[in-house]
């Protein structure tokens, strides 16, 4: 689960992670009042107005501005609130700006990158630091790997003091800056593990000319599987930032990810779903989604799956690929037939069912009288998808 920058900073602050003073605003007047408060409390001659959306690259897209007076903050907030911000992470559709973070300005001396996430290849947490603050870390790792240090952290022992010092040495810091960075990294790791985060990314981490070490930006993503331990975090979810199709699918406990293709997929099992998407691509189509209805696919979940797929106007054909192991194929076929009767299935639907009671399911589909195209095997299904996409 993703959250906004200001929410992430509020959480980090509770764990002793140094962050700038900031106030969230939902209107130009609130932004102005926040600026008045910050100018009174801070020594900085400027404040920063930052658009709050679930995407990076805001600065280049005009989502981060400096202001020297409350009146200027008001004007910038008027211009920024309600606009659609398009960055390299939002896609061409962009995201609407509904809230702003008004934050104290920093007298920046140096910028770095610090991030913590799970390294699945080693089953350990990995602390990453780079001298290239403000840059995309993937680009740094690819083009200048010598500027990125990765430190494996055994979750049984946690981050050791020497590892935090190793990271600070890599950043070539000395004196108070060194001590403050070690303290910062230690606090960040504590926060990361305590809140069951999937990633805690500070980009950039700044060192001011006064020696302060702070998180100028913060990206915190939670492990959704651990949210039962942090039910208060559910209040931080901003559904308006999420794909509406994915939100609707989650209500029916469907694992759905929207893509930009033209073939809708309905599959049971993540591995089979990935293989199905590959076959669609090889057959000349492009998958429009990842949709895993789970091992216990019922008529209700199949119907909801069809509704969600058909909501995507880019879909030109649908491939249903079910292996009947936990769930019987005849039960799935019944769900497909019932869903087809309730939902306006105006698109070609290719159905491939294998496993328990597959022959019974095949007979049910053949006798349904509906426009359902049966496929024998995955290759045949991919071939029929290709044929369905070809212009008449």
Swiss-Prot record:
All copies of domain ATP-grasp, residue ranges: 9-248
Cofactor: Mg(2+)
Catalytic reaction equation(s): succinate + ATP + CoA = succinyl-CoA + ADP + phosphate; GTP + succinate + CoA = succinyl-CoA + GDP + phosphate
Binding residues for substrate: 268, 325-327
Pfam families per record: ATP-grasp_2, Ligase_CoA
GO MF, any single term: succinate-CoA ligase (ADP-forming) activity
Gene Ontology BP annotations: succinyl-CoA metabolic process; tricarboxylic acid cycle
Family: Belongs to the succinate/malate CoA ligase beta subunit family.
HAMAP family: Succ_CoA_beta
Name of this chain's protein: Succinate--CoA ligase [ADP-forming] subunit beta
Taxonomic placement: Bacteria, Pseudomonadati, Chlorobiota, Chlorobiia, Chlorobiales
């Amino acid at each position: 689960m993703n959250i906004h920058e200001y929410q992430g900073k509020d959480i980090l602050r509770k764990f002793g992670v140094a962050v700038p003073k900031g106030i969230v605003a939902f209107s130009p007047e609130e932004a102005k009042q926040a600026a008045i408060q910050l100018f009174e409390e801070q020594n900085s001659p400027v404040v920063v107005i930052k658009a709050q959306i679930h995407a990076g690259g805001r600065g280049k897209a005009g989502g981060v501005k400096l202001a020297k007076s409350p009146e200027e903050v008001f004007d910038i907030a008027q211009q920024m609130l309600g606009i659609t911000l398009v960055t390299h992470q939002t896609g061409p559709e962009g995201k609407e700006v509904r809230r702003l973070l008004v934050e104290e300005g920093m007298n920046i001396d140096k910028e770095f990158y610090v991030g913590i996430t799970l390294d699945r290849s080693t089953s350990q947490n990995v602390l990453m630091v780079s001298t290239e603050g403000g840059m995309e870390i993937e680009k740094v790792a690819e083009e200048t790997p010598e500027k990125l240090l990765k430190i494996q952290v055994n979750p049984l022992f946690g981050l050791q003091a020497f590892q935090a010092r190793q990271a600070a040495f890599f950043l070539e810091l000395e004196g108070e800056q060194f001590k403050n960075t070690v303290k910062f990294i230690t606090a960040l790791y504590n926060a990361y593990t305590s809140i069951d985060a999937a990633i805690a990314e500070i980009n950039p981490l700044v060192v001011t000319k006064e020696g302060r070490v702070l998180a100028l930006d913060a990206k915190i993503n939670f492990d959704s599987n651990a949210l039962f331990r942090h039910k208060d975090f559910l209040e931080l979810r901003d559904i308006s930032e999420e794909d509406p199709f994915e939100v609707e699918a989650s209500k029916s406990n469907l694992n759905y990810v929207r893509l930009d293709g033209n073939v809708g997929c309905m599959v049971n099992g993540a591995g089979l779903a990935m293989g199905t998407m590959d076959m669609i691509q090889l057959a000349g189509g492009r998958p429009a989604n990842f949709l895993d209805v789970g091992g216990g696919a019922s008529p209700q979940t199949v119907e909801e799956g069809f509704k969600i797929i058909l909501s995507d106007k880019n879909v030109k054909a649908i491939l249903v690929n079910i292996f009947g192991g936990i769930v019987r194929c005849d039960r799935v076929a019944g769900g497909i037939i019932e869903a087809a009767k309730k939902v306006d299935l105006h698109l070609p639907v290719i159905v491939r069912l294998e496993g328990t009671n597959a022959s019974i399911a095949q007979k049910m589909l053949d006798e349904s009288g509906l426009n359902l195209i049966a496929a024998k095997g995955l290759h045949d299904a991919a071939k029929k998808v290709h044929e369905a996409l070809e212009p008449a």
